[in-house]
């Protein structure tokens, strides 16, 4: 009897251990599945969220947590400047660029509004209480657009459609005349186009079914292809992007009085045909190739350089170097993530 009980005890013990191992393995597998699921959720594209007009307002690729993790791992200095340094601005540091998944825009082929899924962000500027982001359809089937966001909250407000499909590589705001300027082309020449902040605020595609109407279309014969524009000290600074050589930056003073108040035509006019005005820059300087953006901050001129999937760079020049913006003269160079556009 005792021998039987010993055998029974051993058998129960073995079964108990086996059950424990099985349960532990099952529990461990469950935890593994949960971790993998959480990892997949963490790295995958968030569920698509749309505004009332059908424009996507959710991130196009990753959620903010994953974005910050990747940024911290690959570009720790940029992460520190963005998220760990006391903020110098009340404008949000992390804003979702709308329309990356879908943007309703006029389809040139179908002659109606359809969903564009290839909008490529280009320029950005702060205009009054708004943050404006320009974008074009990389398939060239839809009108180019400007997304309008609340600059404090980053909330998407509306989309402004512009005439045609310009690249919209640059966008700037003149706070004196309250005009918004964008880069484009006119009759095979680079051009600057503008419309007022008041017109932007009133714009609604659903009301007139038309793109916004420009107040000024000004051709720039001295610029091969305008890729960036910025406002500084009552001037517009315009540059063109060149993939294999030196580029150029030209400054255009904005008239503050007279018949051409608020535009860059004043005494620079060479010829006027209808609404097309030809202007020559009052001052110009060479700039490094592959430049996508230019900004003035305190005593610095900052250029962004980007091309393809390689790291981008920010070049910091003293403002006295305006006539010699060669990368060798930069006092500071900061490595940034790829595809850096306007700054």
Segments and roles (model prediction):
Residues 112-117, 160-164, 217-222, 282-287, ...:
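Surface loop/turn motifs at the tips and blade-to-blade linkers of beta-strand repeat domains
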Residues 118-121, 145, 154-177:
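Blade-loop segments of beta-propeller domains
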Residues 120-123, 170, 226-228, 293, ...:
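Conserved beta-strand position repeated once per blade in WD40 beta-propeller domains
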Residues 126-128, 173-177, 231-233, 296-298:
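Residue-level detector of Asp-centered blade-edge/turn motifs that repeat once per structural unit
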Residues 140-147, 188-199, 244-257, 309-320:
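Structural motif
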Residues 136-138, 185-187, 240-244, 299, ...:
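Short loop/turn segments immediately following the C-termini of beta-strands
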Residues 280-329, 334, 341:
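Loop/turn-rich, solvent-exposed surfaces of beta-rich toroidal or solenoidal domains
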Residues 2-111:
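Sequence/structural signature of beta-propeller modules
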């Amino acid at each position: 009897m005792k021998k039987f009980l010993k055998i029974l005890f051993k058998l129960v013990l073995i079964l108990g251990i086996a059950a424990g191992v099985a349960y532990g393995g099952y529990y461990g597998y469950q935890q593994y599945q949960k971790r993998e699921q959480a990892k997949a959720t963490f790295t995958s594209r968030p569920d698509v969220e749309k505004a009332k007009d059908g424009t996507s307002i959710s991130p196009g690729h990753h959620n903010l947590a994953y974005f910050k993790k990747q940024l911290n791992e690959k570009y720790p200095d940029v992460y520190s400047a963005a998220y760990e340094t006391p903020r110098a601005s009340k404008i949000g540091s992390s804003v979702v660029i709308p329309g990356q998944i879908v943007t309703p825009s006029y389809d040139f082929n179908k002659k109606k509004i359809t969903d564009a899924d290839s909008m490529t962000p280009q320029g950005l500027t702060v205009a009054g209480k708004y943050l404006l982001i320009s974008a074009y359809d990389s398939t060239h089937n839809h009108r180019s657009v400007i997304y309008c966001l609340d600059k404090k909250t980053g909330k998407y407000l509306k989309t402004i459609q512009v005439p045609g499909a310009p690249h919209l590589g640059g966008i700037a705001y003149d706070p004196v005349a309250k005009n918004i300027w964008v880069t484009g082309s006119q009759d095979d020449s680079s051009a600057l186009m503008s419309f007022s902040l008041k017109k932007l605020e009133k714009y609604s595609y659903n009301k007139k079914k038309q793109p916004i109407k420009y107040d000024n279309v000004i051709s720039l014969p001295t610029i091969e292809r305008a890729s960036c524009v910025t406002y500084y000290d009552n001037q517009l600074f315009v540059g063109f992007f060149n993939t294999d050589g030196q580029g150029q930056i030209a400054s255009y003073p904005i008239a503050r009085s007279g018949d051409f108040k608020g535009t860059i035509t004043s005494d620079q006019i060479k010829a006027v045909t209808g609404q097309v005005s030809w202007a020559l820059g009052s001052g110009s300087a060479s700039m490094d190739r592959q430049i996508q953006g230019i900004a003035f901050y305190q005593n610095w001129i900052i250029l962004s350089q980007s091309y393809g999937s390689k790291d981008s760079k920010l070049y910091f020049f003293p403002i006295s170097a305006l006539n010699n913006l060669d990368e060798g003269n930069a006092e500071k160079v900061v490595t940034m993530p790829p595809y850096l556009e306007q700054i």
